[in-house]
Amino acid sequence: ASSKPGWYLMIVKAVLNGREITYDVTFNKPEVYLMGPVTEAGDWTVKEPWALFTVPTTADGEFVSPAFAHDGSGNDSPRAYVIIPGHEKNWWHSEFIVGISGDKISYRGKGGDQKRVDGKAGQKMYLNFTTDTGKIE
């Protein structure tokens, strides 16, 4: 835990021990990454340093991606994710995108790929987790 205000990625792990549930709570840096063919590498490389979003300094601020290096549409549209320690190979378990409405964050969860907004080289992804909104421009 921290006494410093700011953005954190809170991870809660629950383990069933007989009839009791034990919780382990950790607070990590809020590292949000851009993913996919729109990145500088143009592929599905995990934790690409170039792909790290900037973190807002206010409670209602936006996480902002680097400018897309390439166009992306359909399954190659811009995606974002956070890494849950121990799940680096399954980054899509913590994936989110700007949904097809163009103004809401859509979380993948356990489902398949969602419909997403296309992106053009030079555009950025903006995510506001306080209002659960996002945009690509």
Placement of each model-derived feature along the sequence:
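Structured interaction patches on ligand/partner-binding surfaces of diverse proteins
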Residues: 1-17, 88-136
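Aromatic-rich carbohydrate-binding modules that target alpha-glucans
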Residues: 28-75, 85-104
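C-terminal edge beta-strand
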Residues: 14, 21-27
